[in-house]
């Protein structure tokens, strides 16, 4: 399909569980990823549609203006952010619509050309940020907005879940 792997995502057991992929445009720099496929473990993460991302202009000010505008609209639920991803380095802000789908607004991400080789990254790196709040347990899961608070109260954050997975992988090794 003309994609290059930017990051091969490794699970706690060391096996690949997904990838961040970019379009191959030769020596022309392109966004760190256009497509991200991750197989999350367990029954709580069935792996359907995760989220759509929308680039705002090159301005952090525009991202923040959008954040505060979204807070004034009673139709959206804030999911995660504002922060900066480790992988791809973009600043992000995630919101849910009334149907429970997640939408990312982002800016200022890495640009890579075809000469940049594939990198190996841990699943922990996917959900961690250079700065920003911890990743909620509901991230990457499509569910009705009225269920989000209940799920978050019952389940750990994604970093907590990953820690449990890493401990289980060490015990099984």
Model-identified regions with their sequence ranges:
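Intrinsic, low-complexity N-terminal interaction/targeting segments
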Residues: 29-37
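Short, solvent-exposed aromatic-acidic interface loops
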Residues: 40-42, 109-110
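Short amphipathic alpha-helical segments
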Residues: 33, 48-52
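Vicinal oxygen chelate
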Residues: 54-102, 107-113, 125-127, 131-173
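Core segments of cupin and vicinal oxygen chelate
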Residues: 1-28
